[in-house]
Swiss-Prot record:
Function, as annotated: Involved in maceration and soft-rotting of plant tissue. Hydrolyzes the 1,4-alpha glycosidic bonds of de-esterified pectate in the smooth region of the plant cell wall.
Natural source organism: Aspergillus aculeatus
Protein's UniProt keywords contain Nucleotide-binding: no
Annotated catalytic residues: D222 (proton donor), H244
Protein's UniProt name: Probable endopolygalacturonase C
Enzymatic reactions: (1,4-alpha-D-galacturonosyl)n+m + H2O = (1,4-alpha-D-galacturonosyl)n + (1,4-alpha-D-galacturonosyl)m
Family statement: Belongs to the glycosyl hydrolase 28 family.
UniProt cross-references to InterPro entries, sorted A to Z: Glyco_hydro_28, Glycosyl_hydrlase_28, PbH1, Pectin_lyas_fold, Pectin_lyase_fold/virulence
């Protein structure tokens, strides 16, 4: 009996060993995601009223989407949107206003990578520039704040922004790469009254690469676009009214004095001082190359239809050769002067400093023909 019990116990033990489940495999341990980063990516923040500018400056890196709703930016204060987290989306809602102070600005500053800044339907950034306008612009009188610094932006977009009555220059684009601006409206028409607004450039571009501006509507009192330095810049499907037209320059006297590969395409220029202008500063050095104006229509130019000067800033002197203008194309450019006080085409080049120009289907009428053009390149004429 004892032997039988021992045998039975041995069998039960063997069964128990065979039936014991295998130890489960340990799962691979991975590091938990940073909860603070997840929070940042998922956070929508809204800032409004007179304290909104201060709060967004302190909290902007905690937000992936920032709504600026009816913001009232205090006097002497920049709406600080610099150094945003990659991928941040900023949306203006309602009317954004700015307190009055004589200072240089800017009123708004944005920087970062993969940033989107846009205006919601009906949103307005109102500079109320009449508080500063005195006919002097940036050349004297009251110190006036520039409006919007789009500096050090990479792979970013600014779209559907409506800016009204800027005190002085509007967009400063500097140190930017792969930046697209779409459907921007700049309305400074109130500044036409008594010629009080001045130097209200729409887009000033410097030291930037791969910049695209399309669908802009600019009503101002200075350059619609002024490209002082940069490469691969495209401006298209836009309207410029009341200002100084589509400008390269002024080039010279800066750290970077090279403008290369610029295209203006499908632009209407209305009631402006001139439609097309290239400005190389007298006595300075740099280069302007691969410039194309294509499908440009203009009407009622007051001073010039087309003007190219290598003695800008000192037009009483003989043009210099330090900023050559090469590979300059005009194609399908048609426009009118307002009256015979307007010179249809004026070219003032230094000796041998303008070359490889190609103009086709270019017509300017309604003004006077210049007899003072200098060193006009082969195949080009001031009498169209």
């Amino acid at each position: 009996m004892v032997r039988q019990l021992a045998l039975a116990c041995g069998l039960l033990a063997a069964v128990a060993v065979q039936a014991a489940p295998a130890e489960p495999a340990h799962p691979m341990v991975t590091e938990a995601p940073d909860a603070s980063l997840l929070h940042k990516r998922a956070t929508t923040c809204t800032f409004s009223g007179s304290e909104g500018a201060s709060k967004v400056s302190k909290s902007k890196t905690a937000c992936s989407t920032i709504y600026l709703s009816a913001l009232a930016v205090p006097s002497g204060t920049t709406l600080d949107l610099k150094d945003l987290n990659d991928g941040t989306h900023v949306i203006f809602e309602g009317e954004t206003t700015f307190g009055y102070e004589e200072w240089e600005g800017p009123l708004v500053s944005v920087s970062g990578t993969d940033i989107t800044v846009e205006g919601a339907s009906g949103a307005v950034l109102n500079g109320d520039g009449s508080r500063w306008w005195d006919g002097e612009g940036g050349n004297g009188g009251k110190t006036k704040p520039k409006f919007f610094a789009a500096h050090d932006l990479t792979s970013s977009t600014i779209k559907s922004i409506y800016i009204e009555n800027s005190p002085v220059q509007v967009f400063s684009i500097d140190g930017a790469t792969d930046l697209t601006l779409t459907d921007i409206t700049i309305d400074n028409t109130d500044g036409d009254t008594d010629d009080l607004a001045a130097n209200t450039d729409g887009f000033d571009i410097g030291e930037s690469t791969d910049i695209t501006i399309t669908g802009a509507k600019v009503y101002n009192q200075d350059d619609c676009v002024a490209i002082n330095s940069g490469e691969n810049i495209y401006f298209s499907a836009s309207v410029c009214s009341g200002g100084h037209g589509l400008s390269i320059g002024s080039v010279g006297g800066r750290d970077d004095n090279t403008v290369k590969n610029v295209t203006f395409y499908d632009v209407n220029v209305l009631k402006s001082q001139q439609a097309i202008r290239i400005k190389a500063i007298y006595g300075d050095t740099g280069s302007i190359s691969d410039i194309t104006y294509h499908e440009i229509a203009f009407s009622d130019a007051t001073d010039y239809g087309i003007v190219i000067e290598q003695n800008y800033d000192d037009t009483s002197k003989t043009p210099t050769t330090g900023v050559p203008i090469t590979d300059f194309t005009l194609e399908n450019v048609i426009g009118t002067c307002a009256d015979d006080d307007c010179t249809e085409v004026y070219i003032a080049c230094g000796s041998g400093a303008c070359s490889d120009w190609s103009w086709s289907s270019v017509s300017v009428t309604g003004g006077k023909v210049s007899s003072k053009c200098l060193n006009v390149p082969s195949g080009i004429s001031c009498d169209l």
